[in-house]
Amino acid sequence: MTTLTLNTSLLSSRRILAAFSGGLDSTVLLHQLVLWRERHPDVTLRAIHIHHGLSPHADSWVRHCETVCERWQVPLVVERVTLADNGLGIEAHAREARYRAFAQTLLPGEVLATAQHLDDQCETFLLALKRGSGPAGLSAMGERSPFAGTLLLRPLLRETRKTLEQWAVRHGLCWIEDESNQDDAYDRNFLRLRALPLLQQRWPHFPAAVARSATLCAEQERLLDELLASDLTDCITTEGTLRLSPLMSMSDVRRAAILRRWLAMRNAPMPSRDALERIWQEVALARDDASPCLRFGDHEIRRYQSQLWWIKTVAGQHETTVAWPVWQTPLALPAGLGTVQLVPGGELRRPREEESVSIRFKAPGLLHIVGRHGGRKLKKIWQEQGIPPWRRDTTPLLFYGETLIAAAGVFVTREGAAEDKEGVSLVWHA
């Protein structure tokens, strides 16, 4: 019986989605998973190929992968992704698009298997070292990682590229060669083609030694996670915001570790040391009467009520009006704000036949809301209700004609209150 080189101890799941580019590494992975399936008939195996459209050979690679999967009786999903310049660089953006497609393709109970190996681990470590990463970044890749509500497995992470080549030759496997892998303008290719061969010529076990260092860094991070768990519990609210008061008495090092872990929990990119310092100095310690904001790509960090918030950047809609001619159906909101819907059963009156329905994001004059005496301006109501400033011109306001009826999830006006049991509710799916 053929001895598999993949780490089968990872394969407790019986449903596996294998990332399959058609290159050497993923071909060996898929071949070994097919052999694993033969030994365990209860295993369900699928493959996914990502068509980036970057190479003129991309279509022929799809045909190659289809041929291989048909021969091995593995269902194949082909996902085409479009890459646009988002400032990350083509390598990072392609990876982001690839893993987004993986997440969308995974079925319930399925795990993702990818073909990274020991040489990849070494490259990842050195790239992190080049960026000046700390222990978290230098931990590189784990054999098992949380991903999209399931697991990402790397069963070949202990094997070298040479081992995979030997397996492929011995079993007569065919694979494709991506011409971009020979372009040393890409950092990873530079390491693989030029730097690592020199290092391995001098120190043959260099990749294995680097992998051990990555493992030690990962162990240090896990220990820190354990030691800081109580601090995190004290600092993080049920809304996922970060309380500032416990951080004030912490050392700089401890506070930075808490900030990093909070951002990781919010799925934010790992900040540099300079970025952490800016978060603390420019946002956390800003004047009490300020509304500080620090942008990170399409997200931002803000401070409100002595808490830090990690939020997606959304353009204010202060001047926007969205007509809702058929109010019985859901209405799509601008700027990715989601949808609103009027559903039966609630405390809002239905619109009269002559009243036009619209969604707006500002309301003039004094407003009289249910449960409050006297009139207030909208700004005062937002403050009383604890609505953060950045949500005040993106929270949908329901109007019948020129009359404000309700703010989604916040308040109902007296003019909008239902007088019978035929009321409706304004539901906002953000």
From Swiss-Prot:
What UniProt keywords are attached to this protein's entry? Answer: ATP-binding, Cytoplasm, Ligase, Nucleotide-binding, tRNA processing
Q: Where does ATP bind?
A: S21, G22, G23, L24, D25, S26
Query: What's the protein called, per UniProt?
Result: tRNA(Ile)-lysidine synthase
InterPro entries the UniProt entry points to = Lysidine-tRNA-synth_C, Rossmann-like_a/b/a_fold, TilS/TtcA_N, tRNA_Ile_lys_synt, tRNA_Ile_lys_synt_N, tRNA_Ile_lys_synt_subst-bd
> For this UniProt entry, what's an example GO CC term?
cytoplasm
* Compartmental location: Cytoplasm
Please quote what the entry notes about the protein's domains: The N-terminal region contains the highly conserved SGGXDS motif, predicted to be a P-loop motif involved in ATP binding.
NCBIfam families given in the database record: lysidine_TilS_C, lysidine_TilS_N, PRK10660.1
Give any single GO term for biological process.
tRNA modification
GO terms (molecular function) for this protein are:
ATP binding; tRNA(Ile)-lysidine synthase activity
SUPFAM superfamilies assigned to the protein according to its UniProt record, in alphabetical order: Adenine nucleotide alpha hydrolases-like (SSF52402), MesJ substrate recognition domain-like (SSF82829), PheT/TilS domain (SSF56037)
Give TM segment ranges.
none
Per the record, the gene is tilS
Question: Known EC number(s)?
Answer: 6.3.4.19
